[in-house]
Design a protein with these regions (language model features):
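Alpha-helix initiation/capping motif
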Residues: 2, 228, 278, 320, ...
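N-terminal pro-sequences and low-complexity stem/linker regions of secreted or lumenal proteins
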Residues: 447, 462-795
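Bacterial N-terminal signal peptides that target proteins for export
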Residues: 1-10
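Predominantly soluble domains enriched in secretory-pathway, periplasmic, or organellar proteins
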Residues: 14-481, 486-487
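A short, polar/charged loop/turn motif at coil->beta-strand junctions and beta-hairpin connectors
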Residues: 9, 43-47, 173, 552, ...
Length: 795
């Protein structure tokens, strides 16, 4: 078989990490290719007179007064801790918020929004002081996340807008007093990590029954913070939650406390445990093993049971708070024996029924609890996309749909259309553009959440809901046809991952696929195509991506391929694992909205910026060697230290699936660390390197154990200075010689000016070796799966 024949057996999959449909038909599938049929109705906002908007609701909190339905609290607070909404396109200040729902309104409606423009935060934790003040108001404590603050608001339940001081947006900031919790830090702040804030990042909150002690889950501090004498001296005590392995990061998230305040429970995202702390002694008294990635915590009314949502395990752990033992683990999957993927996050209780928000299956599991450890799932309720928070008030279930039920082309508009936007561009929203201050909004801000109010179903209604959920998730109805009914004839897959391009930007003007089937695209958006959308301003025709189009027409045009990602972090996880975990979905939004943290989503955990940073001294000094930098980076790869990557899904990655199937695989650029000769020299000089970096790769190592020995050590990971294939100069040189010299930068280029490292050059050299061996009659060493990352599509 000659090289041309080998190439003809390849299946080249060209994807972007934010592919979405061009259609706005509400009957068509939304992200992930599944229809959404949310039960109930959307909660309205009385200010805007349209559906209330929230950026990734993560919790609901009921007010402690007795002025509401049934003599319970009048208000329900939705805690919106995602990237944040964007009021207009003039800036990128993602505004998190607290939405105040008046349960006395008919129907319940949002009557106040308190906005926290970045870097301000409402980060997961919101609690009321249970003790009312003389005027009937309550203190309201709110985690400030990145800024290491605990905000203190006053809540007046008799008022129509109960929270003071307010921040109604769009150009307001929170002016409430706060408690500085930087004192919980065990490490100094650095401009190279967490945007120069001390690594504390308060998240979940709980408060003692007397209202005088606050408990804080410090997500980057790996600790429980205790603030005693809350009204006066405010003494801070830190309880380290790490195990003996101090290089194991546990990421505390939620906290719950018993009324007697003799025990506090902390869910730790990366420890598979709920840690029990005795506050009086500031000491850990138990570690209760639960499922992978424990997230939400909920105590029953008697505080005898603690329910724990295990997001990466598709389960809920039940802990006996007397013995601090897990007495039951309830599966909330659709059936046993299937891989995890529901991602339970939010919890709510009503009597003996536990409601569990399954974020990735767009459903709420209804669990009938049993004291004898025989709890069972009664059925499922359909929701919007990514249900991430739940509350029950009377006979109404409130569902925070983290990614909404359909959005238009502004982060301030949500609806029930089932539509997702086709990426930001100048026309969005249609007919307005930038002149109206709405066009061109950021993609992560566009995908926002909303709140559904659902009447609790009786048994027949729950049965109908369950069938709908099963249909939505492809478990009922016609079976989808397999690409190949029998054994696949495909021997090799070369999976090319690019990003920051929508389908329509590249293929929107392709009229038909290779077999003649009409393609579904919008040619006006095809700015990287070959039609009118790609024409120069003077009207001159351009054909910008002929190779992409040739591959798509030969091997497959995925015009109906849906991916539930909005940016690089979740995009690379969807691309390589077909999943994005709770950690990725939450933490990347905080990071991308300029609320600190670091890029934790491709195998590193808490890696500081080791590269030259303007205004900061070098981490290493002028005599640093390559291995010094490499060893520093290895300190932040969890598997090298007996730990787990907090971002890692239980089903792992495509290459792990290949290994389980007995297939060979090789990786080019994904989940790797690389250093070039120019990188090391730039670190020595503490000066940013210049484009293009075609210098040799001098160090390369995997961030996943299953990639050890399975990657090309010359191929670079993400780096905007290393060319994917060519530079402008090498391209023009090739044109000037009518193609007699290659446009690709490679190590054996005939022109010394273009000799060096490019991603395509490295891959092509290795591929030619595989092809030559096969042509010479040797065994076929081309891997069954090749994963190839091309990162230079960023604009």
């Amino acid at each position: 078989m000659n090289p041309r024949q080998i190439a003809a057996t390849l299946l080249a999959l060209l994807l972007t990490t934010c592919l979405v449909s061009s259609s706005a038909n509400p009957d068509e599938a939304a992200s992930e290719g599944r229809p959404i049929t949310p039960a109930g109705s959307l909660v309205q906002d009385l200010t805007t007179r349209q559906a209330a908007v929230g950026a990734m609701p993560v919790d609901f909190v009921r007010s402690p007064d007795k002025l509401g339905p049934g003599g319970a609290g009048r208000f329900l607070l939705a805690v919106n801790s995602g990237h944040g909404v964007q009021f207009n396109a003039s800036g990128n200040r993602g505004q998190q918020s607290i939405a105040v729902i008046d349960l006395n309104a008919k129907p319940a409606a949002v009557v106040q929004n308190v906005y926290f423009p970045s870097p301000q935060s409402v980060n997961v934790g919101v609690v009321f002081s249970p003790v009312a003040q003389e005027d009937g108001s309550h203190s309201l404590y709110v985690s400030g996340g990145f800024e290491n603050k605990i905000w203190i608001f006053q809540f007046h339940p008799a008022n129509q807008r109960p929270i003071t001081p307010g921040s109604p947006g769009p150009n307001t900031t929170v002016e409430a007093p706060f408690i500085d919790v930087t004192g919980f830090a065990s490490a100094a702040n650095s401009p190279r990590y967490n945007s120069d804030r001390a690594p504390v990042y308060p998240s979940g909150l709980a408060i003692s029954s007397d209202g005088n002690t606050l408990f804080v889950a410090n997500n980057l501090g790996d600790s429980l913070g205790i603030i005693e004498d809350l009204r006066l001296a405010r003494r801070l005590t830190r309880v380290d939650l790490r195990p003996q392995n101090q290089e194991h990061f546990v990421y505390p998230y939620s906290v719950a406390v018993l009324n007697e305040s003799d025990k506090a429970y902390v869910s730790c995202w990366n420890d598979d445990s709920v840690i029990v702390v005795q506050p009086g002694r500031a000491k850990i008294v138990a570690r209760v093993t639960v499922g992978r990635h424990p997230t939400g915590l909920l105590l029953n009314a008697q505080q005898t049971r603690l329910y724990v949502a295990n997001s990466n395990d598709d389960s809920v752990s039940v802990i006996d708070t007397t013995t601090d033992k897990e007495i039951e683990r309830i599966s909330v999957r659709f059936s046993e024996g299937v891989p995890p993927g529901n991602s339970p996050e939010g919890l709510a209780l009503r009597g003996d029924d536990l409601y569990v928000a399954n974020a990735h299956s767009n459903s709420v599991a209804v669990v009938e609890l049993s004291d004898k450890g025989r709890s069972k799932v009664r059925g499922f309720i359909p929701t919007g996309q990514y249900p991430s928070a739940l509350a029950v008030a009377g006979r109404t279930l409130f569902v925070g749909n983290g990614k909404g039920t359909g959005v238009q082309n502004s982060s301030m508009i949500v609806d029930n259309s089932g539509r997702v936007p086709n990426g930001p561009n100048e026309r969005f929203p249609a007919g307005t553009g930038r002149a109206a201050g709405q066009g061109g909004q950021y993609s992560v801000a566009l995908v926002v959440g909303n709140i559904s109010a659902v009447n609790l179903p009786d048994d027949p209604a729950l049965a109908r809901y369950t069938q709908q959920v099963m249909r939505n998730n492809g478990l009922l109805g016609p079976r989808q046809a397999r690409l190949f009914p029998a054994a696949s004839p495909i021997r090799h897959v070369i999976y090319v991952i690019k990003e920051n391009r929508t389908y329509d930007q590249v293929f929107g003007d392709v009229e038909k696929s290779g077999d003649g089937t009409r393609a579904d695209g919008d040619p006006s958006l095809a700015i990287f195509g070959g039609g009118e959308g790609a024409a120069r301003p003077d009207g001159e025709h351009q054909d910008i991506t002929p190779n992409h189009r040739a591959l798509a027409l030969r091997f497959g045009l995925f015009d109906r391929f849906f991916v539930n990602s909005e940016a690089s972090p979740d995009g690379h996880n969807w691309s390589t694992a077909a999943f994005s975990t709770d950690y990725v979905d939450k933490a990347f939004r905080w990071n991308y909205s300029r609320r600190g943290r670091t890029y934790d989503f491709e195998g590193f955990n808490r890696l500081p910026n080791y590269e030259p940073l303007r205004g900061s001294p070098s981490l290493f000094g002028p005599k640093v060697e390559t291995e010094d930098v490499a060893n520093f980076m290895r300190r932040f790869i969890p598997y090298l230290h007996g730990s787990r990557d907090v971002s890692e899904p239980e089903t792992l990655y495509l290459w792990d699936a290949a290994a389980r199937a007995g297939l060979t695989y090789r990786n080019y650029g994904e989940f790797l660390a690389t250093l070039s000769e120019a990188d090391v020299e730039a670190i020595r000089k503490n000066r940013t390197k210049t484009y293009p970096d075609v210098s040799p790769t001098v160090s390369a190592f995997a961030t996943k154990k299953s990639l050890e020995g399975r990657f090309n050590t010359e191929y670079r990971n993400f780096d905007m200075d290393t060319p994917d294939s060519m530079t402008v100069d090498s391209y023009w040189a090739a044109r000037e010689t009518s193609g007699r010299t290659s446009a690709f930068i490679n190590s054996s280029h005939v022109d010394a000016r273009y000799r060096g490292n490019s991603r395509l050059g490295v891959w092509l050299e290795e591929f030619k070796t595989f092809a030559a061996e096969r042509a010479a009659g040797a065994a076929d060493r081309l891997p069954n799966l090749s994963v190839m990352r091309l990162s230079n599509d960023h604009t």
